[in-house]
Amino acid sequence: MLLKGENLVKNFGGTVAVNNVSFDVMNGEILAIIGPNGAGKSVLFSLISGLFQPTSGKISFEGENITGFKANAIARKGISRTFQLTALFDQLRVVDNLALGFQRRATSGFWGTLLHSSQWKADKAMMEAKVIEMLGFIGLENKTFDFVSTLSQGEQRRLSIGIALASDPVLILFDEPTGGLIQEDTDEITRLIRKINQTGITICLIEHKMRMVMDLASRIVVLNYGRKIAEGNPADIANDPQVIEAYLGRKRNA
């Protein structure tokens, strides 16, 4: 077991966004977390990634209690997260954005960088090689020197994924990676996520596009009004009465 959440609760004033949710993420799997809008999915990701602290409950990663850790400490442990809204430097080139992602792994420090030490030179060579390799992996090798502002939405999403990979994560949290994308770009992102998983990286995914979820996920957790209402393989979830009610009931009441 890679990640474990136990009886997680998150309150915002009088609103209970996550209500006694427990879940496991197994090493090497693709776990999808689904549910209607407002179900608590992104808040749960924020608890895992350290952006929010749980009101109560426990989070363990690789057997260590990481409850209450800040986001930067969580990232150093090997958990990376992507967001639906990309946070890229539009006025920089693709290669520069990726280089900034890899720069966080440099070990030369301030004085080493200032004095161009041997460690700085080694870090620079490593970073340049890694950037070139990553550009090929995410399919943007022909966009290396293009400015981010000229990329399509799908290409920007792939670049964001490349930056998340630059931290050498054990687990990636994908928060609606295909939100707002056309089908062609959705298919491209689906293939990329599968390729990432095949390298041994564990995936936890929030997504509304059910065809994609059913195609990718080995297990699915379903949230509704902050509570976990179902968990199982895609076939079981597709036929679960509570899941059907959560989706169809919301539509009828809309």
What feature does the model see in each segment?
Residues I172-E176:
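Catalytic Walker B motif of ABC-type/P-loop ATPase nucleotide-binding domains
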